[in-house]
UniProtKB/Swiss-Prot annotation:
<dbReference type="Pfam" id="PF08323">
    <property type="entry name" value="Glyco_transf_5"/>
</dbReference>
<keyword id="KW-0808">Transferase</keyword>
<dbReference type="GO" id="GO:0004373">
    <property type="term" value="F:alpha-1,4-glucan glucosyltransferase (UDP-glucose donor) activity"/>
</dbReference>
<comment type="function">
    <text>Synthesizes alpha-1,4-glucan chains using ADP-glucose.</text>
</comment>
<keyword id="KW-0328">Glycosyltransferase</keyword>
<comment type="similarity">
    <text>Belongs to the glycosyltransferase 1 family. Bacterial/plant glycogen synthase subfamily.</text>
</comment>
<feature type="binding site">
    <location>
        <position position="47"/>
    </location>
    <ligand>
        <name>ADP-alpha-D-glucose</name>
    </ligand>
</feature>
<dbReference type="InterPro" id="IPR001296">
    <property type="entry name" value="Glyco_trans_1"/>
</dbReference>
<dbReference type="InterPro" id="IPR011835">
    <property type="entry name" value="GS/SS"/>
</dbReference>
<dbReference type="GO" id="GO:0005978">
    <property type="term" value="P:glycogen biosynthetic process"/>
</dbReference>
<dbReference type="GO" id="GO:0009011">
    <property type="term" value="F:alpha-1,4-glucan glucosyltransferase (ADP-glucose donor) activity"/>
</dbReference>
<protein>
    <recommendedName>
        <fullName>Glycogen synthase</fullName>
        <ecNumber>2.4.1.21</ecNumber>
    </recommendedName>
</protein>
<dbReference type="Pfam" id="PF00534">
    <property type="entry name" value="Glycos_transf_1"/>
</dbReference>
<comment type="pathway">
    <text>Glycan biosynthesis; glycogen biosynthesis.</text>
</comment>
<dbReference type="InterPro" id="IPR013534">
    <property type="entry name" value="Starch_synth_cat_dom"/>
</dbReference>
<keyword id="KW-0320">Glycogen biosynthesis</keyword>
Length: 509
């Protein structure tokens, strides 16, 4: 018999009810309509974070009912992967923002991609936002204002594409100013702004207002403690704002996580114009078929997990063990709680556990992780950097994922881990609240402190010593709905709420 969970948790039959209730939901989408999905990165071409994964997946999740087209800057990496690009339109100069051609390609699955072409602004080495040396490009304000203004021009039908979207879907600060450009020019195209991380706001000095083509009487809409914020301008002017989890949408209306925009966001929420939708994960993350795994497994056949665990231990120089294996797949930064993990590592090792770490980040935390590997050889291993195949094998072989993030707008690693039967141990914040069912599909602790994490680890060790409970939780985690079909249905409703999009089809060229 399963032990009762702690007071305030679910009753002891919660796992059975969870597994019986959660099944894949059918997607029921409306007639095809035109949506321009504006983004600064897309995993098909170039990726700096989770936004790139969303941009690759969400338009495709809606494509079979919506005429979704993506607009992305023509970075060097994009052009290298795009192949032949057809020039189909042009946006004119605006203030100091240069004129740009618009190229078009169609992905193999039929998804149209518009590429904003400017050798001066986008064809350079580095990520979308920083150079190869790690410093931000000095002209980022011009670069992403140009992207935003191009989106507004396309919405107005001024780009010569023979197509006008019924809705602009804008993502994070690099695209947020498009909502302002639409409104400032008298446009009426509905705008949805998705905030993937409120901490990045696109701050620029007031002196740039003229160069960016912001009307003098509208500059106040961007005001942020003596600077201008692209993101604030988007929040003010968008018809609706959403975040990438329900809990994060609530948390950013308060000062603790509102990043100075909490009062504005609370005002939008009070008017019903701020909501949350949890991201999905790609269907290719399937332990039965994953191309990165030598040993596959399923909810009914577990042997492959043991094989993957052995491979992970070998890859990280860990000795053979029957104890629990803890994975860390994360940027090694303070925000992700890596300092907390370093503090509790001795407790994990003393209790018979092992730790495998993959990621890179702040030099001080990298040094702390390296010191742990020296202090506990064969028990703690680390790979500074990132290699996707190794990360997937870690999810497929580890028993637990350590994810004590101080804040987390959504988070993807916990959902990847669950899909592979690896139980998250996570701080109860943002999307982690919405995706980890405490005691059912993982473990949550309420305060980002060493002591709270230690108590949560004790629960995980107790669970590991109860094979029946461990197997039931793994099965519940693997069966948890986390695909883009679920999120797609919610974006369908949000598009219709935002735009009341007319049933007429967009003109397809």
């Amino acid at each position: 018999m399963l032990p009762a969970l702690k007071k305030g948790g679910r009753p002891r039959d919660a796992l059975g009810r969870f597994i019986r209730h959660h099944e894949r939901l059918p997607v029921s989408l409306a007639d095809t309509r035109g949506v321009l999905f504006v983004v600064s990165e897309m995993a098909d071409f170039i990726k700096a974070g989770g936004l790139g994964d969303v941009a690759a997946a969400l338009p495709r999740a809606l494509r079979h009912r919506y005429d979704v087209r993506v607009l992305i800057p023509g970075y060097r990496a994009v052009l290298e992967r795009a192949g032949k690009v057809e020039i189909v339109g042009r946006v004119l100069a605006h203030a100091a923002l240069p004129a740009c051609d618009i190229g078009r390609i169609v992905q193999s699955d039929g998804l149209p991609i518009y590429i904003l072409l400017s050798r001066e602004l986008f064809e350079r080495d580095g990520s979308p936002y920083v150079s190869t040396s790690g410093s931000e490009f000095e002209d980022n304000a011009i670069r992403f204002a140009t992207l935003s203004h191009a989106a507004a021009d396309i919405a107005a039908g001024h780009a010569g594409l023979g197509w006008k979207p019924r809705l602009l879907h804008l993502n994070d600060w690099p695209c947020a100013l498009a909502a302002g450009y639409v409104r400032w020019s008298g446009g009426t195209t509905p705008c949805l702004l998705t905030i993937h991380n409120l901490a990045y706001q696109g701050l620029v000095p007031y002196s740039m207002a003229g160069a960016l083509g912001i009307p003098a009487e509208r500059v106040a809409e961007l005001e942020f403690y003596g600077q201008m914020s692209f993101l604030r301008g988007g929040i003010v002017n968008a018809d609706h704002v959403n975040t990438v989890s329900v809990s994060y949408a609530k948390q950013i209306t308060g000062p603790a996580q509102g990043c100075g925009l909490d009062r504005l966001l609370a005002g939008r929420a009070a008017k019903g114009a701020l909501t949350g939708i949890v991201n999905g994960i790609d269907a290719s993350w399937d332990p039965r078929t994953d191309e990165y795994l030598d040993s596959h497994f399923s909810v009914n056949q577990w042997q492959g997990r043991q094989d993957n665990a052995a491979q992970v231990r070998k890859a990280f120089g860990l000795r053979e063990s029957t104890g629990p294996l803890f994975a860390v797949v994360s940027r090694l930064v303070h925000q992700k709680g890596l300092d907390l993990i370093c503090e509790v590592a001795p407790q994990i090792v003393a209790a018979g556990g092992q730790i495998a770490v993959i990621g890179g980040g702040e030099p001080d935390i990298e040094r702390q992780v390296a010191e742990l590997t020296r202090r506990y050889p064969g028990q703690v291993g680390a790979f500074i950097g990132f290699e996707e195949g190794l990360a997937r094998r870690m999810f497929a072989g580890a028993d637990f994922l350590l994810m004590p993030s101080r804040f987390e707008p959504c988070g993807l690693s916990q959902m990847y881990a669950q899909r592979f039967g690896c139980l998250p141990i996570a701080h109860a914040t943002g999307g982690l609240i919405d995706t980890v069912d405490d005691g059912v599909t993982g473990f949550l602790f309420q305060h980002a402190s060493v002591e709270a994490l230690r108590r949560c680890l004790e629960r995980a060790f107790r669970t590991f010593r109860l094979p029946g409970l461990l197997a039931a939780m793994r099965r519940a985690a693997m069966l948890r709905p986390s695909g883009w079909d679920v999120a797609g249905n919610k974006y369908l409703s949000l598009y219709e709420r935002t735009a009341a999009i007319a049933p007429a089809l967009a003109t397809v060229s």
